Amino acid sequence: GQPKAAPSVTLFPPSSEELQANKATLVCLISDFYPGAVTVAWKADSSPVKAGVETTTPSKQSNNKYAASSYLSLTPEQWKSHKSYSCQVTHEGSTVEKTVAPTECS
């Protein structure tokens, strides 16, 4: 079979355009992992976030590895009221965590 591949994780903060439209969505991209099963957990500061999370089913990429994404929908108030948000991806027993922090400037 294929060798296991750890996912690469990229976390995108809400865009300024989106915040101006009074929305805030964090996007966690998970790519190049094998086998195609991951667990995604979101954290605000260090407390778990359950509401507003949507994670896609992993799909096979052209290189036969898998990719998935997870979305966290927030209000701008929620986004600004925490020091940081983290996307925690667990794959085959190992965990990758990426963190974004809201900037002060609007």
UniProtKB/Swiss-Prot annotation:
CC terms in the record's Gene Ontology section: blood microparticle; extracellular exosome; extracellular region; extracellular space; IgA immunoglobulin complex; IgD immunoglobulin complex; IgE immunoglobulin complex; IgG immunoglobulin complex
In which compartments does the protein localize? Answer: Secreted; Cell membrane
Q: Which GO terms describe its molecular function?
A: antigen binding
Carries keyword Secreted?
yes
**Biological processes, Gene Ontology terms:** adaptive immune response; B cell receptor signaling pathway; immunoglobulin mediated immune response
Q: What is its main location?
A: secreted
Miscellaneous comment as given in the Swiss-Prot or TrEMBL entry: Alleles IGLC3*01, IGLC3*02, and IGLC3*03 display the following serological isotype: Mcg-, Kern- and Oz+. The Mcg-isotype marker is characterized by Ala-6, Ser-8 and Thr-57; the Ke- marker by Ser-46 and the Oz+ marker by Lys-83. Allele IGLC3*04 displays the following serological isotype: Mcg-, Kern- and Oz-.
Q: How does it assemble?
A: Immunoglobulins are composed of two identical heavy chains and two identical light chains; disulfide-linked.
Q: What is the protein name stated in its UniProt record?
A: Immunoglobulin lambda constant 3
What is the scientific name of the source organism? Homo sapiens (Human)
